[in-house]
């Protein structure tokens, strides 16, 4: 294992030989990226939330960043203690690892659309419905639901790609195509959580790499870039970069407790209710894993946090979650570190087909208990469900209006791009789309081969991508305002 292969200064262009300078450059590019700033107005659980104490995607990402830093430091410390092993990380690569992990964590959600997973569902449902009845592509859509590419008609696979919108894949598209951040390959690879291209079918549970390919990790539009990235970092196709495992664990630790805390902040649950729910769910998870030890761990953690929180009754709920987080993060980080080091060979090569915190251990039971309480008692709350339905309706409604641009033949759409007066409605719709997205569309179409240009599906693929880029780039508030404007709701 040579981590200098996985952590280096290579980037698509204008690369610098110095690793420190390259990693610092990545930090600046990411922190100054508009897509990152938009996370402050994208939902974590509660869309269009006015209470600033409730998490947005940005504040969640900051918490993930801290967890990632903690795990990375813990891994470096434990590796340095292994005197019987050759040194895997020198000080230069150890420092780079921490920065790469931090930036992976802070930008891991930049591809998520407005209204979170309901926004994703709305986009996918809309495009599935659109293609299923499309006069030209309905047959290709039917073929897209199964089968592998036979070297003839590629349309079904491009349609499959378009009907599998995924925030993780959109993040790769933002980095490479839309914002053109020109990050180091290792920094981009650090957020490649899933390794399946959108043109591939989801593998069965019995298939190799079924976990790594559980969701779409990148689109066909970025496939050549991912091939290039894997070549530069010596990553086998379908495998991960080692840092992606750390980022994933940091995210798992952060969101499972944060969602419950936000529910308490909004008055949907009380601290005492949370304690009882966690106690019952944790025991249930332990039994499902057939674990008899550590049954009192979560109860003791809650009691300790509760006892310390009562010293400041005026800020009881906030203090409780501060102390509970401390009680939980340390064992979870320690476990993630142990799993990383115990499986370091497979993790180095990116073939480890599991999450660090998912191994049927009591630590796994902790995170599962937190997730299940959130799922059963936060996400299903009437207020949350109402907001999710509104988000679904808003996203679908905007797509309905922009269908005009998709229904045009290619030649007529080209007239629209020059703001032709013959299409006043379509031109006004197009003008609302940011220039960077239109530029990305034009560049992609201009780079098509002659054979691809002769097949209308390729231009249409990038036109659909243009609409998805526009919709998914909106904040919750912008999507809400756009919907009201287009449907004349005052």
Predicted features by range, described:
Residues 63, 249-252, 328, 332-335, ...:
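Charged, amphipathic alpha-helical oligomerization/scaffolding segments
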Residues 36-40, 132, 136, 180-184, ...:
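Intrinsically disordered or highly flexible coil/loop and linker segments, enriched in small
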Residues 1-19, 27, 31-42, 51, ...:
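Sequence-structural signature of the catalytic-core scaffold of metal-dependent phosphohydrolases
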Residues 42-52, 373-378:
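A short small-residue
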Residues 297-360, 368, 380:
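Long, amphipathic alpha-helical stalk/connector segments used for oligomerization, subunit docking
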Residues 341-443:
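Substrate-recognition/cap regions that form aromatic- and gly/pro-loop-enriched pockets
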Residues 416-489:
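C-terminal amphipathic alpha-helical interaction region
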Residues 1-20, 24-27, 427-436, 442, ...:
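Extreme N-terminal flexible tails
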């Amino acid at each position: 294992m040579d981590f200098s292969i996985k952590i280096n200064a290579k980037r698509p262009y204008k690369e610098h030989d110095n690793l420190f300078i390259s990693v610092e450059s990545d930090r600046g590019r990411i922190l100054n990226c508009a897509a990152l700033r938009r996370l402050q107005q994208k939902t974590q659980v509660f869309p269009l939330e006015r209470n600033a104490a409730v998490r947005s995607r940005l504040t969640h990402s900051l918490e993930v960043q801290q967890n990632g830093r903690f795990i990375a430091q813990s891994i470096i410390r434990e590796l340095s203690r292994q005197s019987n092993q050759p040194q895997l990380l020198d000080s230069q690569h150890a420092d780079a690892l921490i920065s790469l992990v931090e930036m992976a964590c802070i930008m891991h959600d930049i591809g998520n659309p407005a209204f979170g997973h309901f926004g994703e569902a709305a986009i996918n449902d809309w495009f599935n419905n659109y293609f299923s009845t499309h006069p030209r592509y309905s047959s290709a859509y039917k073929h897209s639901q199964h089968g592998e590419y036979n070297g003839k008609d590629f349309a079904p696979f491009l349609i499959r790609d378009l009907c599998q919108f995924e925030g993780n894949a959109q993040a790769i598209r933002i980095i490479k195509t839309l914002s053109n951040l020109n990050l180091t390959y290792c920094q981009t690879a650090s957020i490649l959580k899933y390794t399946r291209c959108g043109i591939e079918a989801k593998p069965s549970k019995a298939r190799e790499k079924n976990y790594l390919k559980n969701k779409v990790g990148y689109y066909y539009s970025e496939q050549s870039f991912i091939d290039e990235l894997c070549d530069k970092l010596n990553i086998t196709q379908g495998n991960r970069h080692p840092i992606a495992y750390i980022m994933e664990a940091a995210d798992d630790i952060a969101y499972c407790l944060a969602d419950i805390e936000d529910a308490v902040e909004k008055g949907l649950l009380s601290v005492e209710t949370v304690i009882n729910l966690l106690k019952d769910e944790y025991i249930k998870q332990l039994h499902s894993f057939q674990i008899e030890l550590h049954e009192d761990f979560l109860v003791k953690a809650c009691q300790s946090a509760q006892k310390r929180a009562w010293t400041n009754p005026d800020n009881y709920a906030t203090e409780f979650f501060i102390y509970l987080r401390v009680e939980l993060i340390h064992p979870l980080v320690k476990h993630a570190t142990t799993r990383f080091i115990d499986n370091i060979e497979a993790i180095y090569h990116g073939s480890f087909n599991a999450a660090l915190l998912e191994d049927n251990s009591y630590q796994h039971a902790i995170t599962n208990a937190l997730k299940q309480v959130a799922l059963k008692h936060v996400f299903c709350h009437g207020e949350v469900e109402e907001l999710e339905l509104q988000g679904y309706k808003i996203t679908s409604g905007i797509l309905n209006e922009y269908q005009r641009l998709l229904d045009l033949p290619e030649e007529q759409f080209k007239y629209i791009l020059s703001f032709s007066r013959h299409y006043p409605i379509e031109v006004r719709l197009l003008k609302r789309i940011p220039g960077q997205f239109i530029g990305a569309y034009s560049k992609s179409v201009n780079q098509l081969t002659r054979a691809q240009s002769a097949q209308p599906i390729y231009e249409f693929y990038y036109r659909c991508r243009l609409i998805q880029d526009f919709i998914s780039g909106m904040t919750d508030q912008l999507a809400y305002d756009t919907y009201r404007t287009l449907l004349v709701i005052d």
